Every structure is written in C-alpha cells, then in structure tokens.
Amino acid sequence: MSITKVELREDVGEELKVYSPDQEMSADVAARIDKSIRRARAMLIEERLCWWGENAIPEQCAIPLTWIVAALACTKFGKAGQGYEAGEERGKARLAKLKTPTDITTLQPDPF
C-alpha cells in the first residue's frame, strides 16, 4: 500500500499542528508544506534514501517522511526550536533501515 503527496501534506500539517482533518487546509499552508516536500524528496534522492514515486509513497515510509518534512517545514510556521528539527535525522535513520539493495537503484539523482 502507499500514500499520496496530498496525504503526506495532511500528515505533515497535523504533525506541525497547522491543520486539522475537520477543516480545509489553506492554500498558503499547503504551498509551504508542498515546497518542503519537494525539497525533502530531492535531498533524499541525492542521499539515496528515496526509492518511490512522488505520488506513491510506501506506507511504511509515511511516518519517517512526515518527520523529515516537518523538520524542514517547521521554520515556515514559526515552530523552530520546538523539537521538530530532530525528526530529520530520526526519519533518515528509519528510511535507511527500510530500504533494500534493490530499492536504492530505483531512482537516481538528476545530474546538474
């Protein structure tokens, strides 16, 4: 099973407490989270920790990826220094445990 980018955006919004499932996410909040999702994915591809498609995130990667994106997005919402930053390393460590040798060859970084 997998989750979509929209589901990841909602998970990050809930993690940062800037979104509640019973309300619609504002376009501004969505745009700020989406920017962090794009940057996190690019970084993880470069570090060979991303082996999934942009809109087909393996279910087992959802929590670590949420932690990573929240760590990158927290400053955009005035949440720096509240512990979210630790999620980046924690999430990367979890993704490294999840990947298999065949996973890491699926996506390659784009050359500059």
Tell where the protein language model's regions lie, with residue ranges:
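Charged, low-complexity interaction regions
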Residues: F77-Q82
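Short, hydrophobic/amphipathic alpha-helical patches that form generic packing surfaces
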Residues: I63-T75
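Protruding loop/beta-arch "assembly-hinge" segments enriched in small, turn-prone residues
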Residues: G83-F112
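Conserved short "hinge" loops at termini or chain/domain junctions
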Residues: M1-P58, D103-F112
